[in-house]
A protein has these predicted regions:
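C-terminal outer-membrane beta-barrel translocator/porin domains of Gram-negative envelope proteins
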Residues: 515-517, 566-568, 597-599, 609-615, ...
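Transmembrane beta-strands of outer-membrane beta-barrel pores
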Residues: 527-533, 543-545, 561-565, 586-594, ...
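C-terminal catalytic region of ATP-dependent kinase domains
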Residues: 145-151, 257-427, 432-439, 445, ...
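Outer-membrane beta-barrel initiation region
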Residues: 441, 451-453, 464, 470-577, ...
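Outer-membrane beta-barrel "beta-signal"
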Residues: 678, 820-822, 840-851
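Outer-envelope beta-barrel architecture signal
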Residues: 519-523, 533-537, 551-557, 578-584, ...
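A subset of solvent-exposed loop/turn segments in beta-rich extracellular surface proteins, enriched
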Residues: 535, 545-622, 638, 642-659
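Conserved ATP-binding subdomain of kinase catalytic cores across diverse folds
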Residues: 74-212, 245, 269-286, 292-302, ...
C-alpha cells in the first residue's frame, strides 16, 4: 500500500533518535527556601541538559549548558513584587501571565525556558497539548529544543534598543518560589519554583492612544493622516536583523500615537526581544525545522544567508507599514545604528548579563554582532529589494485618486491623492528591473484610477477596486489588470486595452496585509511496503506559489520519484473562486515498474509454488493527463479528463507473460493510447449515525492510436458507507464495479478486483465487482513514555469476482483478516494488517494521516 510520510512521521522517527541518543538520568535540584532574599537557581536541572556526544551531534548543543548553570537572583512572590500584583490574564502569545499592581501598572511575567515558535508551527498547533504530552519523551524533547534560545541575552538586546533610541521594557530576572502562586502559563506549565523574566507592559487603561497591531492597520485605512513613524519602525526592524530576532509576530508590537502637524504618527513599542542570537546546530535538528515549516529559524552568524527568509514572520507587516519609504530611509537607519552601537556600547550591553555566564558563547555573540553591524547597510539594501519585488499598496476608505505613470522606460511612478483635499499623500518610484508586479487596493470610497504611458517592458499592475463608484482613465498599454465588482461592468466597458476580472467574491477585493506574493517548497518521503510488492522508497518535492489569485494557492507543482514506480508529476491550477481547477498529471515509469499477470478470467491459477517474479511483467509507461475539475460544493465534483498514454511490456524468457503471448505480439511493442473520461463524485453526511455516504461514477473511452480498431468504452462505479454503531465501534464498507464494453483491451487495461488477501491484479476480465467491509473498534489511549498513543483493532471481509467471455464460473473469491492501527502524537496513523485467501496471506503496512 502507498504511504506518504507527513511532518508527523518525521517527528516519530526523530523522537525515537532523541530517546536512544540522550542521557535520560533524572535528578532534582535541592529545594530553595522561600525566605532567602537571594537564591542560586538554574532554569533546568543538570540532568536535563546532560546529553551524549551522539545526541549533541544529531540534535546540537544549542545553549544547553546555560540552562543548567545556576545564577544568583532575587526571590519574589506575587505579594512582594511591585508591592503586590494580581494576575489579569494569561498572555497566550507569550506563554506568560499579565500582572497588574495597585497603581494599575502592567508587567508581563514568563518563565525562562519553556516553549517558543517551535511549537507554534501548524503541526504542533494541531497535535500538541502540554497536559496530554506531560512526562513523555516528546515533551522533554520540545523543552530541550527551546535551548536554541539564549535564556539571558534579552537583557542585552533591550539595552541595545535603548541605546539606539528605541523602545525598551526594563527586563529583569527573579526567582518565584514554590507555593507563591497557583497560576499556570498559557501552555499549562506550572509557574512556581522557576526563574522568571518580568518586563514592563504599556498600560492600555491610562494610555488610550496605544493600539494593537490589528487596530493600527484598521486606523491606517481610515485616512492617510494616520501614519506609522516609518523611521522608528525601520530602525526597529534593522535592529532585529542586527541581533537576529526572527520572532516579530504582530502580537509583539504595540503602537503609541502622537500628534505631528495634521497627522497622527504611531511609534512602535516592542514587547519581546527574547528570540535574538539563536544557536541552531545538529544535523537532524536543522532538517526537522525545515520539515515543520520553520526553516527561517537559523543559526546566528555574521552574514545572513537569506535576509528575506530570516524575516519570514515580519515580512508581511513590513510590506504593509513601510511602503512610503525608499531605500535611502533603510540605509540611513542602518548607518545610524552602525554609528550609534559602538564596540563599547555592545560590550556594556553584554556585561549586564547575570554573573557567571560570561562563557565562550557570549564572546562568540559579541564578535558576531560587531561583524554583522558593519554589514548592516548591505543587509538593509537586500531586504528593501525583497520588499520591492511585489509591493502591495493601499488607498484609504475615503475617495482616492491613483495616478500611474509609465512613460519612463526604466521606472514606474505611482502617486495617490485625497480627492476631497487634492493633497498628495503618496509618491513612489519603482524600478522595472527590481519590481516584478504591483498590487494596488483602492479600498472603500469612490476612487479614480488613471494610467498613462506605454513602454516595451511594462511592470504588471493589479488594480483591485473597492465597493464605491469607481472611475477609470487608461491609455493603451499592456499588463494592467483590473479587479472590479460585477456592478462595475458598465464603467469598464468603455475602457480598452486592460484585462478585466469581474467578481463579487469578497476575498478578491478585501485587503489582507498577510496576503503577499510568496512561495513554499517542501520535501515529503514517499514509500510502499506490502508482501506482494516489497519495499520501494522515494520522495516528493512540492512547489506552491501564492500570488494574487489563490484558491487556496495560485498554482502547485509536485514532482516525485519512487524506486519502483519512477517519476510522477502533478500540477494544480485553480480558478479565482476555487470552484474550478485545471490539473496536469504525468507519469514516467522506471525500468523496475511491473504489473502482475495471471491470465484472464475468474478461475486463473495463482502459481503458489512459483516465485513472485514469475507473474510480474515489467512495463515501461508514460502518461500525460490534463483534466478539468468543477466543484459544485465541497463534496461534489465533476472531472473531465483526457490522457495520452504509452505502454510497452518487456520480453523475458522465463515468465508467464511469454508463455501466454507469442514473441512478436503487439504487447511487447510500443502502444499509444488516448483516453477520454468523465467522472462525478459526491459525498454526504446523512446523520450522526451515518457520517459518510459517498459515490463515484466514471465513464470513458480508450483507443489505440497505432491500431484504431482496438478501442473500447468503459464505465466504473463505487459506493462508500460508514456507519457509527457506537462512539467507538464503526462499520465501513466500499463496493466497486468496472465494465468494459468490448474485448479490444490489453491486460493492463482490464477490469480487476482489489481483494486484500490476493496479489494485485490477481483476477482480471471484462467485468468486475468487489466489496470490502471492516468493523473497527477504537480501544482508546495506550499509556507509554514516548508520546500519546491511541489504538484500535479491526476485522475485515472482502469478496469479489470478474467475468470473462467464454468462461463459465460461478465462483466468488473471498479474503478475510484484520489488524491494528496506532495513532501517534494525535496526528499520524499507522495500520498493520494481514489478510488471507485461498492463495496465501498478504501483509500490509500503511502510514498516513487517517484510517
Amino acid at each position: 500500500m502507498k504511504m506518504r510520510l507527513s511532518p508527523a512521521s518525521y517527528i516519530v522517527f526523530l523522537v525515537m533518535l532523541f530517546v536512544f541518543s540522550a542521557d535520560m538520568t533524572a535528578s532534582v535540584l535541592p529545594r530553595v527556601g522561600e525566605g532567602d532574599s537571594l537564591v542560586r537557581k538554574s532554569i533546568y536541572p543538570p540532568s536535563a541538559t546532560r546529553k551524549s556526544d551522539l545526541y549533541n551531534k544529531l540534535w546540537g548543543e544549542h545553549y544547553r549548558t546555560l540552562y543548567s548553570l545556576p545564577i544568583t537572583v532575587p526571590a519574589v512572590t506575587l505579594q512582594s513584587l511591585w508591592g503586590g500584583v494580581k494576575v489579569v490574564e494569561q498572555a497566550a502569545d507569550f506563554q506568560g501571565l499579565l500582572l497588574e499592581n495597585n497603581q494599575q501598572q502592567l508587567c508581563l511575567l514568563k518563565p525562562l525556558g519553556g516553549y517558543t515558535t517551535f511549537i507554534e508551527s501548524k503541526f504542533f498547533q494541531e497535535v500538541y497539548n502540554k497536559k496530554v504530552f506531560k512526562n513523555t519523551y516528546l515533551d522533554q524533547f520540545i523543552g530541550d529544543a527551546y535551548t536554541i534560545i539564549n535564556p539571558y541575552t534579552f537583557i542585552s538586546a533591550d539595552y541595545l534598543a535603548r541605546s539606539s533610541g528605541l523602545s525598551s521594557n526594563n527586563s529583569r530576572i527573579f526567582y518565584l518560589p514554590e507555593h507563591s502562586t497557583r497560576d499556570t502559563v498559557a501552555n499549562g506549565t506550572s509557574i512556581e519554583n522557576k526563574l522568571v523574566s518580568v518586563i514592563d507592559v504599556p498600560d492600555f487603561n491610562t494610555r488610550p492612544n496605544i493600539l494593537l497591531t490589528e487596530e493600527l492597520l484598521d486606523t491606517l485605512q481610515a485616512n492617510k493622516n494616520f501614519q506609522v513613524d516609518q523611521v522608528l519602525y525601520i530602525r526597529e526592524r534593522l535592529l532585529d536583523m542586527l541581533i537576529g530576532d526572527w520572532n516579530k509576530i504582530p502580537e509583539n508590537w504595540n503602537w503609541l500615537g502622537r500628534s505631528e502637524g495634521d497627522s497622527i504618527l504611531y511609534a512602535p513599542i516592542v514587547i519581546d526581544r527574547n528570540h535574538a542570537f539563536t544557536k541552531v546546530d545538529g544535523v537532524l535538528f536543522k532538517q526537522m525545522l525545515r520539515v515543520l515549516g520553520l526553516g527561517f529559524i537559523v543559526n546566528y552568524d555574521a552574514s545572513p544567508k537569506s535576509v528575506r527568509k530570516e524575516n519570514t514572520l515580519g515580512f508581511a507587516l513590513d510590506m504593509a507599514l513601510t511602503s512610503q519609504s525608499d531605500v535611502s530611509v533603510w540605509t540611513g537607519q542602518a548607518r545610524f545604528i552602525r554609528q550609534t552601537l559602538t564596540d563599547s556600547i555592545i560590550d556594556k550591553a553584554f556585561s549586564r548579563l547575570p554573573k557567571g555566564i560570561e562563557d565562550k558563547e557570549i564572546k562568540r555573540i559579541t564578535r558576531i554582532i560587531k561583524e554583522r553591524r558593519e554589514k548592516l547597510e548591505v543587509i538593509a539594501k537586500n531586504y528593501f529589494a525583497s520588499l520591492q519585488q511585489t509591493p502591495v499598496l493601499t488607498g484609504t476608505n475615503r475617495s482616492d485618486r491613483f495616478v500611474i505613470d509609465r512613460h519612463n522606460p526604466d521606472s514606474l511612478f505611482i502617486q495617490m491623492y485625497d480627492q476631497q483635499t487634492g493633497q498628495r499623500v503618496f509618491d513612489r518610484k519603482y524600478s522595472r528591473k527590481k519590481t516584478k508586479e504591483i498590487w494596488l487596493y483602492g479600498l472603500e470610497g469612490d476612487d479614480r484610477f488613471e494610467v498613462s504611458g506605454r513602454v516595451n517592458k511594462e511592470v504588471p499592475v493589479f488594480l483591485i477596486a473597492g465597493k464605491g463608484k469607481n472611475t477609470y482613465r487608461m491609455e493603451p498599454g499592456h499588463h494592467i489588470r483590473v479587479y472590479e465588482y460585477e456592478s462595475g461592468k458598465a464603467v469598464l466597458d468603455t475602457v480598452p486595452h486592460v484585462k478585466k476580472v469581474f467578481s463579487d467574491i469578497p476575498e478578491i477585493h478585501q485587503y489582507d496585509y498577510n496576503k503577499i506574493k510568496h512561495h513554499k517548497m517542501s520535501f515529503t518521503p514517499w514509500g510502499i511496503y506490502d508482501s506482494d510488492k516489497g519495499f520501494s522508497l522515494g520522495t516528493f518535492f512540492t512547489y506552491t506559489m501564492y500570488g494574487f489569485k489563490r484558491s487556496p494557492f495560485t498554482y502547485q507543482h509536485r514532482i516525485g520519484y519512487n524506486y519502483i514506480q519512477g517519476f510522477v508529476y502533478q500540477g494544480i491550477f485553480p480558478s479565482y473562486d476555487g470552484k474550478k481547477s485545471f490539473n496536469i498529471d504525468a507519469t514516467i515509469s522506471s525500468r523496475r515498474n511491473f504489473y502482475n499477470f495471471f491470465g484472464f478470467g475468474n478461475n486463473t491459477d495463482g502459481y503458489k509454488d512459483a516465485k513472485k517474479n514469475y507473474n510480474r511483467v515489467h512495463i515501461r509507461q508514460f502518461k500525460l493527463s490534463p483534466s478539468f475539475h468543477l466543484d459544485f460544493s465541497e463534496k461534489e465534483r465533476l472531472v473531465l479528463q483526457a490522457s495520452w498514454e504509452m505502454f510497452k511490456a518487456k520480453e523475458t524468457n522465463d515468465r508467464f507473460i511469454n508463455q501466454f503471448y507469442p514473441e512478436d505480439h503487439r504487447i511487447f511493442k510500443t502502444n499509444l493510447f488516448i483516453d477520454l473520461g468523465l467522472s462525478f463524485h459526491t459525498e454526504k453526511e446523512i446523520c450522526s449515525f451515518i457520517p459518510k455516504l459517498g459515490g463515484t461514477l466514471t465513464g470513458g473511452w480508450k483507443m489505440n492510436l497505432k491500431d484504431a480498431s482496438r478501442n473500447f468504452p468503459y464505465a466504473e462505479a463505487s459506493v462508500e458507507l460508514d456507519v457509527k454503531i457506537t462512539d467507538r465501534l464503526t462499520w465501513a464498507t466500499m463496493a466497486k464495479t468496472q465494465q468494459l464494453f468490448n474485448n479490444k483491451y490489453e491486460f493492463y487495461q482490464a477490469a480487476s478486483t482489489e481483494l486484500r488477501g490476493y496479489r494485485d491484479n490477481r483476477f482480471i476480465g471484462k467485468q468486475s465487482f468487489y466489496q470490502y467491509s471492516d468493523i473497527r473498534l477504537d480501544m482508546g489511549k495506550l499509556k507509554n513514555p514516548f508520546t500519546p498513543l491511541k489504538y484500535g483493532v479491526f476485522a475485515g471481509f472482502d469478496y469479489g469476482r470478474v467475468w470473462f467471455p467464454g468462461e463459465q464460473s460461478k465462483r466468488w473469491h473471498t479474503s478475510y483478516g484484520g489488524g491494528i492501527w496506532l495513532t501517534l502524537i494525535n496526528k499520524i496513523t499507522t495500520k498493520y494488517s494481514c489478510f488471507g485467501s485461498t492463495d496465501s496471506f498478504r501483509f500490509m503496512f500503511e502510514l498516513g494521516l487517517g484510517f
